[in-house]
Amino acid sequence: MSLDINQIALHQLIKRDEQNLELVLRDSLLEPTETVVEMVAELHRVYSAKNKAYGLFSEESELAQTLRLQRQGEEDFLAFSRAATGRLRDELAKYPFADGGFVLFCHYRYLAVEYLLVAVLSNLSSMRVNENLDINPTHYLDINHADIVARIDLTEWETNPESTRYLTFLKGRVGRKVADFFMDFLGASEGLNAKAQNRGLLQAVDDFTAEAQLDKAERQNVRQQVYSYCNEQLQAGEEIELESLSKELAGVSEVSFTKFAAEKGYELEESFPADRSTLRQLTKFAGSGGGLTINFDAMLLGERIFWDPATDTLTIKGTPPNLRDQLQRRTSGGN
């Protein structure tokens, strides 16, 4: 992985009681040793693979102001990180999920793009076997489950300040409160809505195939084509490019997909991140509620699966063998 650390700082927040988070600040930066580089590379990999929310700095953002000064050389990185950790403590203390942790600030470069990553990492206990085959306790950073993480694309921020996607953060397992916390700490407002962009793309694709008067099989083939392209972009860590997608759909209609989307006013960006859960709707129907979970390939609708909107009834012809076996055993047993 072509990742180069420029500067990295580590501090700690210790929860002493319900109201107080104690600051433990380092007096020096971390050295970018091989172990440190491996840790940052793993954090970068894990973070890049997760669904993120997008934002941009507000004009009053204190973090943005001090970061800009640091980038201009008016403040060193260690002082910036120490002051930011103090503000982080003040914001985090407002929320009941505040458990403290190790606060990481890392300025690094990956594939010619500069990033500032801010993360609160937890220390977990585990076991290890030593050279004498004794089992001893040990601790490790829980990078895979880190959910208090934000990253600023410094290159995008400085070269395209009007962008709405240079700042990203995770919403976390505890829901909106983590997102709210990061918005407050970063002094940011919500930017690009990737999920809305993906929903708009799906609607545009359906309308595009309808206007082209494709039959059912042809329309499903186009949906599969769109899904394959978008999924490839997702797996590669790349964004959906409308122009590239339009080339994939050349021949579907006399009008290009990009021209169709622009003329119909779908307000799609030229490129935007893929959202896995939304894109799945191109090839599958899924839903759950009231003790019922249903998931099936879209091509089965109208062939083996039929929906009557008047009665809201779903009819399935030919159940899966394992389900049929369970039903037969239950009914034959009289239970």
UniProtKB/Swiss-Prot annotation:
Gene designation per UniProt: yejK
GO molecular function: double-stranded DNA binding; single-stranded RNA binding
HAMAP family: NdpA
Protein name per its UniProtKB record: Nucleoid-associated protein YejK
Entries under InterPro entries matching the protein: Nucleoid_associated_NdpA (IPR007358)
Subcellular localization, as worded in the UniProt entry: Cytoplasm, Nucleoid
Keywords: Cytoplasm
Cellular component GO terms held in the UniProt record: bacterial nucleoid; cytoplasm
Similarity comment text for this entry: Belongs to the YejK family.
Organism name: Shigella boydii serotype 18 (strain CDC 3083-94 / BS512)
